Regions:
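N-terminal subdomain of lithium-sensitive/metallo-dependent phosphomonoesterases centered on the IMPase/IPPase/PAP
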Residues: 1-99, 266, 274
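Residue-level signal for inorganic ion chemistry
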Residues: 35, 58, 69, 102, ...
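Generic detector of well-ordered alpha-helical packing
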Residues: 59, 63, 82, 98-101, ...
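Short loop/edge segments at beta-strand edges and connector loops
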Residues: 80-82, 150, 195
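DPxDG-like acidic metal-binding loop motif
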Residues: 88-144, 163-164
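Short strand-turn-strand beta-turns centered on an Asx-Gly dipeptide
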Residues: 121, 149-150
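A structural micro-motif at secondary-structure boundaries
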Residues: 148-149, 155
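An extended, acidic
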Residues: 154-274
Length: 274
């Protein structure tokens, strides 16, 4: 896929250049081509120290993407879920999650994605949610509209939690006090759905979901999501309502409407300072 002018805002210091966006799209194309033939095949699986699984596809894909970044922008930093950080204090840092939703990938569920993010001085500025098995792709750049499969994506209006469709990966990702806070929002929501991995954030950007609330999120989990959500007209913060950046985590909330975001934050924060 080639970058078009509508994807790139006018040149402003601190915003990604057309060359950076083109590389991000090339990385997403590479991820799709690499992962698709390996999906629902027999792959080696190991357990990381934190108990989560990692496959040979995760590690091999991240290595491929890192090599392409280093070849094109040798002064940029790279932070990845599997390979850690290199030049992590650089002004421009790429943030990679080669397979977000590894368990779904292992189980043959197509909701996993490759997340490609780019930060400038700790602020997420570019993000791609690439779903190789589904053929879905959201592209967000600071200062520019979000695109889904080449067409503009837009959140929907939703003023109140009582009118909202709420999504989260699952209850096991919350600590006990976090789950109690989440349950207050869940009890008030019109619809609540478990599962979906990062696909839920893309669906929020396209106006199908109103709220996504998660915990146990690291930089590689949320960096690419922020520009996608914001470029579609939504808002994504931590549970205190603060902007997300390189030092944020682990609790995140995304909303398509600032009004429902404010209501959900109030419910999450009852009797608790996050």
């Amino acid at each position: 896929m080639t970058v078009t002018n509508r994807l790139v805002p006018p040149a402003v210091d601190g915003r990604p250049t057309q060359e950076m966006l083109q590389l991000a799209i090339d990385l997403a194309d590479d991820a799709r081509a690499f992962v698709r033939p390996r999906f629902r095949s027999r792959v080696s699986i190991e357990q990381k120290p934190d108990g989560t699984p990692v496959t040979e596809v995760d590690t091999a894909l991240e290595a491929r993407l890192r090599n392409r970044i280093r070849a094109r922008f040798p002064k940029h930093g790279v932070v990845g879920e599997e390979g850690g950080g290199q030049r992590a204090n650089a002004d421009w840092v790429w943030v990679l999650d080669p397979i977000d939703g590894t368990q779904s990938f292992i189980l043959g569920k197509p909701t996993f994605a490759s997340l490609i993010g780019l930060m400038h001085r700790g602020v997420p500025m570019l993000g791609i949610i690439e779903h190789p098995a589904l053929g879905d792709r959201w592209v967000g750049v600071a200062g520019s509209p979000t695109f889904f499969n080449g067409e503009p994506a837009r959140v929907r209006a939703c003023a109140h939690v009582a009118e909202a469709a709420l999504s989260t990966t699952g209850p096991n990702w919350f600590a006990q006090d976090e789950l109690a806070a989440f349950d207050r929002v869940r009890a008030a929501a019109k619809v609540q759905h478990w599962g979906g991995d990062c696909h839920a954030f893309g669906l929020l950007a396209s106006g199908f979901i109103d709220l996504v609330i998660e915990s146990s999120h690291h930089l590689h989990d949320f960096c690419a999501l922020v520009p996608v959500i914001e470029g579609a007209g939504g808002v994504m913060t931590d549970w205190a309502g603060d902007a997300l950046g390189s030092d944020s985590g682990p609790r995140v909330i995304a909303a398509g409407d600032r009004r429902v975001h404010a209501e959900a934050l109030a419910l999450l924060g009852e009797g608790k300072s996050w």
